[in-house]
Amino acid sequence: MELVRSFTSASFIHQGGEACIYKVQGESSRTYSFKWYNAGVSYDASVIEKLQKLNVPGVCRILESGAVEGRPYIVYDYVDGVSSKELSPMPLGVALHSLRKIVAALQALRGAGISHGDINPSNVFFDRSASPVLMDFGIVGPGALHYSAPERFSGAAPSEKSDLFSLGALLYFWVAGEPLLEGETFEQIRGAMENLGPEKIGLSLLEKIQAKKVSLSPEDLSLLEPLWKGLLEPSPDARLEDLEELDELLEIALEKHGGVGVQLARALENFGQRISEILQKNETKTLEKADLPFLNSGKRSKKGKKGFYFGACLFILIVLALVALVFFGRSETSVDETGALLMQKTRDSQMQAAPDSVEMPNLEGVLERLKPEEGE
């Protein structure tokens, strides 16, 4: 919980059904993303523990996890980028090239025994270099319904096969600018899944071409068809074998579209410029400040320490003042009282073993002279 206790400020970014996400600043002025789950929500801690040990290119690092104020949380790197949800539709070459990068990141995760489980446009960010970064993981539920594999609706755990389906739905959104599956409820989306097929997907894209909503050619529709067949099958067994096979299909499709030459380089440059423009616009927006309860804990402790030190100093000053008053403030003490006090001190001193070189004074004569004469 070291990072959480070091947060000095927070700004609200997004509220979902399971958690709120904040942009937070640490004591070292470093920026983090803080995902604070709602009360009663729990996640798969074993997946988070594995992810904290990994540093995979193209995957946002998880730095800390735990619970604060009775609610689970995750701290991860803040990605200065734009959600792919804001960047669709995108050029087909950019979409195919970017999906290959995501597949490479997912393959690295599979090597550690991890499936993503919640691949959707909002969980893929593009940084300033136009490189995709995978965010978040499906550690709570089936993930975004429009991008979840049918078996996830039945409670199946995330797997390589379910990630393949989600990648197909993601690719469709990237090139079409709209979700493949229509519907607002669980039943509606599940019903749309049962009617999926490469032909229907192709017709859907053709309608968008005719409506001039997307810039695709008939050749583009043809090179995409094997991907729809391999990814968007309702049955896991009918999908591609694994991520490696998907990467091969993406490479073939990219070559048919023009390869990784000048055309793709120009498209990526324009895409990066688009990202920069959105980020510049976002910089002018002021995020809503969030007063997270534990942000003040450090401040309160510092204030508490300052108050303690102030109180201690004040107490010492009062004690010193009282001592000074006792020993130096008895200006109205009577002569008799003064004499008695001096006499008592003299007797006390004489009873102590004093050094031979010191002669103790006899104050009796002085005291006799200090006594007032009768009648005064």
Predicted regions and their residues:
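ATP-binding glycine-rich loop module of kinase domains
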Residues: C20, G26-S42
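Activation-segment/catalytic-loop signature of the eukaryotic protein kinase fold
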Residues: S65
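Conserved short submotifs of the Hanks-type protein kinase catalytic core
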Residues: E69-V82
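Activation segment signature within eukaryotic-like protein kinase domains
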Residues: S98-L99
